[in-house]
Swiss-Prot record:
Pfam families: KOW, ribosomal_L24. InterPro entries: KOW, Rib_uL2_dom2, Ribosomal_uL24, Ribosomal_uL24_CS, Ribosomal_uL24_KOW, Translation_prot_SH3-like_sf. The keyword Cell membrane does not apply. Keywords: Ribonucleoprotein, Ribosomal protein, RNA-binding, rRNA-binding. The keyword Secreted does not apply. Part of the 50S ribosomal subunit. Signal peptide: none annotated. Transmembrane segments: none annotated. It comes from Acidithiobacillus ferrooxidans (strain ATCC 23270 / DSM 14882 / CIP 104768 / NCIMB 8455) (Ferrobacillus ferrooxidans (strain ATCC 23270)). This is Large ribosomal subunit protein uL24.
């Protein structure tokens, strides 16, 4: 089970972009990877197509393993681990392990 969701703000813990923050654009559950905005950028060579769209070198985000990111906790100013808690009304929510604060309910 992945505890990271789309639109979460995360911090990169390991790799060439260690320390960078960004928003999760997409969660790839089957690979346990996430696409993070402006993190792990790669260059791809694109051919021009028949409709006149120009080719060239395009920079885009590559997936990063979920174990290399942590959700950003504004209260502590860094990455934090996540747990789950059931509220009185029976709703299951994500909470930060360090301070027990509820993470953005939907």
């Amino acid at each position: 089970m992945l505890k990271v969701r789309k639109d979460d703000e995360v911090v990169v813990l390991a790799g060439k972009d260690k320390g960078k923050r960004g928003k999760v654009l997409k969660v790839l559950r089957e690979d346990s990877r996430v696409l993070v905005e402006k993190v792990n950028m790669i260059k791809r060579h694109v051919r021009p197509d028949r409709m006149g769209k120009a080719g060239g070198i395009v920079e885009k985000e590559a997936p990063i393993h979920v174990s290399n990111v942590a959700i950003f906790n504004a209260a502590t100013g860094g990455g934090d681990r996540i747990g789950y808690k059931v509220l009185e009304d029976g709703q299951k929510v994500r909470v930060f392990k360090s301070n027990g604060e509820v993470i953005g309910r939907r």
